[in-house]
Amino acid sequence: MTSLVRQAPLVRQYPPKKVLFGIRHAEGWHNVLYDLIGMQGYSKFPDTSLTTEGMRQAAVAIAPKVDFVLVSPLMRTLQTANIMYPDTPQIALECLKEYPQEEHISNRRSETSLLRRLFPKVDFSDLTDERQPWPNPVDVDENVKRVKEIVMNAKAIRFAVVTHSTWLKYWMTGTCNAEPELIHCHPYKLVI
């Protein structure tokens, strides 16, 4: 038996398979405002935060065990990630911001210095500008490609990607249709 083991061809070692969970942020004020006043709800207030209900959603959500959290640098996603994953390393990535960027002021992020003060455990090194340029046209294909490259080059195996409904739907379906929206705080398994 020992000689058979020695004679057996070596099994090629492939890189470990990555596991990703896409999570839409919890309910934000722009979601409530949209229900009350329509599209104006997206254009009145920049970088909206979570509602009390949103904080509750994040607190009771079932957060899959992960090694790292990649998070959009918008207030509502950072709050969601911090509530769902308080002890997991988090990296904010500009490429995870919501689409579209040109018309919805609710998708314009806060100043980097403010975000660093509010979320001291988050790595904001990807944010190169203090103030996000606006309007900021987005290439969704390039953004998804960048996240995939980051994940594939990382040593970690399990990731949460805390972002936005339209962004996640583009990854999952290749389309940017706003409706129907994904469920708040639900972990969608992403294929890479």
Language model features: what each stretch is:
Residues 63-65, 151-157:
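Glycine-rich phosphate-binding loop signature in dinucleotide/nucleotide-binding domains
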Residues 79-83, 103, 170-174:
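A short acidic (Asp/Glu
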Residues 2-14:
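A short, compositionally biased domain-edge/stem linker segment
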Residues 18-23, 70, 154-167:
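Beta-strand elements within well-structured catalytic alpha/beta cores of enzymes
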Residues 11-92, 116-118, 186:
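Active-site-proximal alpha-helix that buttresses catalytic centers in soluble enzyme cores
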Residues 28, 167-168:
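Short active-site segment of divalent metal-dependent hydrolases/proteases
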Residues 29-33, 37-49, 84-145:
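Phosphate-handling substructures
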Residues 175-192:
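Domain-level recognition of soluble alpha/beta enzyme cores
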